Every structure is written in C-alpha cells, then in structure tokens.
Amino acid sequence: MKKDIHPKYETTVIRCACGATVEAGSTVDDLTVEICSQCHPFFTGKQKLVDTAGRIERFRRKYAKFNQAQEAKQDQ
C-alpha cells in the first residue's frame, strides 16, 4: 500500500447555528451547520411558524387582475 495518500482523520467539532456542539470524526477541522437535531422541529416537536399569511395575500393580489380578466372574458 502507498503511504501518505489518505487524508488526515481527526476529531472534529461541529457547531450549529443554535449554539449546540457535537464532536465527530472527519477530515475537516471545523464544521458549521445551520440546523441540527437539537433545534430541528422534527426532533424537538416544536413547530416554527412561517409568515404564510403575507405570502397568501401577495399571491391573491398578484392573480386578482388575472381572475378579473378571465371573468370579463367569460361574460362577453
């Protein structure tokens, strides 16, 4: 076997945006992740509300003109 062809495998600290840290083995020195099992809604059982009301209103305003044009076309 050839010597010195494999990457260095060492203990790595994985940091989440929520502040949690986990130690694991990796070839990368430090890892940063956006979400982990300690803050993900699936694992915690908590749901984060997303502002869907604003999105729905924006969608309705966007397509209101389209719907009015379709109704006017059908009335003719």
From Swiss-Prot:
Q: How does it assemble?
A: Part of the 50S ribosomal subunit.
Keyword Ribosomal protein assigned to the entry: answer is: yes
Instruction: Reply yes or no: does the keyword Ion transport apply.
Output: no
Q: Name one GO molecular function term.
A: structural constituent of ribosome
Q: Which cofactor does it need?
A: Zn(2+)
What's the protein here called?
Large ribosomal subunit protein bL31
Name the Gene Ontology biological process terms: translation
> Which annotated residues bind Zn(2+)?
16, 18, 36, 39
Keyword terms: Metal-binding, Ribonucleoprotein, Ribosomal protein, RNA-binding, rRNA-binding, Zinc
Q: What does this gene product do? A: Binds the 23S rRNA.
How the cofactor is bound: the record states: Binds 1 zinc ion per subunit.
- Record's GO cellular component terms: ribonucleoprotein complex; ribosome
Family annotation (SUPFAM superfamilies): L28p-like
Family, according to the entry, reads as follows:
Belongs to the bacterial ribosomal protein bL31 family. Type A subfamily.
Q: Which gene encodes it?
A: rpmE
Read off the PROSITE patterns from this record: RIBOSOMAL_L31
